[in-house]
C-alpha cells in the first residue's frame, strides 16, 4: 500500500494553508532522526524502507569517474542541504545523493514564504537563497555519519557562493567550501545557476566562470570529480561556450539543469497565498514545466561534446519515460526532486523498473548503451 499517495500527497496538493517548507523540514527531520538512531526500531524501519523502495538490476548500473552507481536515479541538491539524512538516501532506493547547496558562510536564506507548490502545473517555485549551516558544518556532519569514509552510495556535494561574499570574492568563497569538504564527497558540483542569490548567474559567463573552475581544479589534489550545474535559461550559444570551457578545464561533467526563471511556463497569475502578480515574484521554477528545456540542453551538450562529457539530467522527471528521454538525449545519470515530492518515494523504483522495460523494447543490453542514442537523430 502506498501510504504516501493515500495520506501525504493529498495534503500536499490540498488548498489548505500548509507551508511546503514546513512539510519538507519535518519530513527531513524524521529521516535525520532515523539516520542517527541506533535503536532496534530504527533498524527495523530502515530495513522496511530498503525492502519497499530498493531495486537493483545490473543492466542499470553505471560506472563514471571511478565510481559505481548501482542505479542511475539520484536525489537532486536542495532537499538535504546540510546532509542531516545522508545515510538514509540509499534506503529509499537512490543510486546517489547530492547534498547542499552549501556555502562557505552559514546563512539563513531569503525571507519566508520562499517555497510554493503549484499542483495544477506539477511545479514548485522557490526562492530559498542557499539557506544552510555552512560547508564546515556539513563536513562535521559527514565525519560523524561516515567516520571511516565508507558510504553506501556515492555522495555529491553542491557548492554555492555565500550571499555576503561579493562577486569579486567568488573564487576564494568556492575554494574555501571545497577545502572544507574535498575529502568527504565523491563528486562536487559548482553551482553558479541558482536565480536566488543576487548576481550569481552572471558567473556563468565564461570570463567569470573560468577563474573559479581553474582555482578549484588547482585545489583538487585528490582529483575528485568536479561538475558544473547550469541554468536552462542560457541561450544555445552560451551552453556551447560553457561545454567547451568544461572540457578545457577538464571537468568531470555537467548537470543540466537548474531551475528556470521563465514564468510564462506557469498557468497561474499568482503564487499560492500571494496577491502580487507572478511576474513580480523572484524565484525559480522546477518540475514539469522545466522538462522539455532541460532535455534540450542535455541533447545540445551531448552533441557539442560528442558524448565525451558525462551529463547528469535533472528537471521535470515524474516517470520512467521522462527519465528515459533524458538518457537517450545524452544523460548518463538522472536526478529527481520535485517529481519525487509529487509522486512519492516509490517513484525511484518505478523509474528503474520502467527503464528496464524500455531497454528490453529497444533491444539494448544495458543503460550505458542507451545514453545519447537519440541525440544525433532527433
From Swiss-Prot:
Which residues are annotated as active site? 194 (nucleophile)
Q: Which cellular compartments is it found in? A: Cell membrane
GO terms under cellular component: cytoplasm; plasma membrane
Matching InterPro entries? Aldolase_TIM, DHO_dehydrogenase, Dihydroorotate_DH_2, Dihydroorotate_DH_cat, Dihydroorotate_DH_CS
Statement: the UniProt record of this protein carries the keyword Nucleotidyltransferase = no
The record's listing under PROSITE patterns reads: DHODEHASE_1 (PS00911), DHODEHASE_2 (PS00912)
Known cofactor(s): FMN
**Transferase: present as a keyword of the record?**
no
Q: Where does FMN bind?
A: 77-81, 101, 158, 191, 229, 257, 287, 316, 337-338
The Gene Ontology biological process terms listed for this entry are:
'de novo' pyrimidine nucleobase biosynthetic process; 'de novo' UMP biosynthetic process
Q: How does it assemble?
A: Monomer.
Q: What is this protein called?
A: Dihydroorotate dehydrogenase (quinone)
Which gene specifies this protein's sequence? pyrD
